[in-house]
Amino acid sequence: MWGKILGAFFGFLLGGPFGLLLGLFLGHKFDKARRNVYRGGGFGGFGTNRANSEERQAEFFYAGFAVMGHMAKAKGHVTEEEIRVASAIMDRMNLHGEARRQAQNAFREGKEDGFPLEETLAKVRQNCAGRADLLQFFLELQIQAAFADGSLHQNERQLLHVIARSLGFSERQLEQRLHMQEAAFRFQQGGFNQQHGGGFNQAPTRDQLADAYEVLGVTESATSQEVKRAYRKQMNEHHPDKLAAKGLPPEMMEIANQKAQELQAAYDMIRKEKGFK
């Protein structure tokens, strides 16, 4: 229902009566997709020629928060901290009004016992076939949610292995991303945003440098050329414009922008420390 209301409202604002009809249609598709996932039917029409990009984006958005809700329950029950973490992620995405309510509803449905996790992930993988960077974004979103409280519970780790395997990632690939996200969490706590915006007024500590290297996926012994290659690879995989062109929902673009800023800050810190351009 909410999909139709939101679609009609924005459709009318953007396109008058015709836009209203189109908005109603797309909103109906969103509502139908959400019901199909929750009832165990998976993403109906996902990956087919009939499925338009708006529907796929809506389904990706729904799945992201529904799986996040399932992740929050991995410890056995959902605490106020998990709810706070989900709200913080919504804040990072600048979600307000109806978009935020849709995310909250998806998160809530993912917590329920009957949520079809593996069917949902299989359809996400099907829809993103040939778009490895979108699958990586989806996995990293769940890793960020798991790490957002500063620790990773064993049950969360086990569930992340299920998610990664379902999306086509190996255990080694997951563990690498877990290490990188743990470093990214520390890097964020160290205030890289303020440092990046202010031009690094103070020399970074040894720990900050170590985290910066790990954010890029290289060791401290890496040469300048290796650092540059790692940076270009990471930016190529996480560039917001490229992700948008491949179907990343607009609501999730802010997360992609923040990741790109994080990579840039880590690279700048290492570049200045090593003294290369």
UniProtKB/Swiss-Prot annotation:
GO cellular component, one term: plasma membrane
Family annotation (Gene3D superfamilies): DnaJ domain, TerB-like
UniProt keyword annotation of Cell membrane present: yes
SUBUNIT field: Homodimer.
Comment field on protein domains: The transmembrane domain is a dimerization domain.
Physiological role: Regulatory DnaK co-chaperone. Direct interaction between DnaK and DjlA is needed for the induction of the wcaABCDE operon, involved in the synthesis of a colanic acid polysaccharide capsule, possibly through activation of the RcsB/RcsC phosphotransfer signaling pathway. The colanic acid capsule may help the bacterium survive conditions outside the host.
Designated name of the protein: Co-chaperone protein DjlA
Lineage start: Bacteria, Pseudomonadati, Pseudomonadota, Gammaproteobacteria, Vibrionales
